[in-house]
């Protein structure tokens, strides 16, 4: 099955500039969390459009493979939170059903729908939800991750690492697989995970904006780019930058943006 409306053998975007490396060199850099998911229903066209208009050059995307093989932009494993009154599990529900559901400002989007319309200078911070936060051993979830890797490789002309930043969490072991594919990896951490974390396995380190100065000092000492999450107003942004964050994962495009 082709994941894109284009011929699967034809790259959507040719390999070119390393957009990810250039993006991470900015101070500060901004990533739109869940495509503006606090101001707008998460992962919808409204939030995507608002994020791009606000000047974001990176979008954070959670994806899950649905029953018919498409990767759907959704954080949760089922639809009950984002579409009240429904209870579809993403993994065993086909896109033909999911596409009929409506959140407050529109329907769900597939990863292909997003890639088809974003400019070539946009970084996609992709979180493959079933493998990003644990030592996943389920063959189906690992196969879905492999399918996603292959799709991105074709879509971005053999060099997806130039457009995609791979997102994981402290307990996720997918970083090794992503690094083997050439990706830079961003890990989102919480204060109680810092002491036991090996920063060397990641390229970008995320932390709650409200974490104490001692926590941020440890992150900054790594010499790696850092990103504060989840920012929804100017006060939080200022505090995060004062603690040394080099990037902001912001979720309210009209208030916090580049």
Summary of predicted features, one role per range:
Residues 1-258:
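Phosphate-group recognition and catalysis centered on beta-loop-alpha active-site segments
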């Amino acid at each position: 099955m082709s994941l894109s409306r284009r011929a699967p053998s034809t790259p959507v975007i040719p390999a070119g500039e390393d957009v990810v490396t250039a993006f991470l060199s900015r101070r500060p850099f901004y990533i739109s969390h869940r495509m503006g998911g606090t101001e707008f229903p998460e992962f919808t066209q409204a939030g995507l459009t608002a994020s791009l208009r606000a000047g974001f050059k990176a979008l954070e995307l959670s994806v899950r493979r649905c029953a018919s093989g498409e990767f759907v932009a959704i954080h949760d494993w089922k639809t009950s939170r984002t579409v009240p009154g429904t209870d579809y599990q993403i993994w065993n529900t086909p896109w033909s059903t999911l596409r009929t559901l409506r959140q407050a400002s529109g329907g769900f989007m597939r990863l292909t729908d997003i890639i088809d319309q974003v400019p070539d200078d946009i970084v996609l911070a992709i979180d493959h939800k079933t493998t990003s936060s644990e030592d996943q051993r389920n063959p189906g979830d690992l196969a879905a991750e492999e399918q996603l890797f292959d799709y991105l490789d074709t879509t971005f002309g053999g060099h997806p690492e130039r457009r995609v930043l791979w997102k994981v969490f402290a307990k996720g072991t997918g970083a090794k697989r992503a690094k083997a594919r050439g990706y830079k990896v961003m890990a989102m951490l919480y204060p109680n995970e810092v002491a036991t974390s090996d920063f060397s396995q990641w390229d970008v380190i995320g932390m709650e904006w409200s974490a104490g100065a001692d926590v941020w000092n440890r992150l900054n000492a790594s010499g790696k780019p850092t990103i504060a999450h989840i920012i929804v107003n100017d006060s939080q942004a200022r505090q995060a930058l004062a603690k040394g964050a080099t990037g902001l994962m912001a979720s309210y495009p009209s208030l916090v943006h580049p």
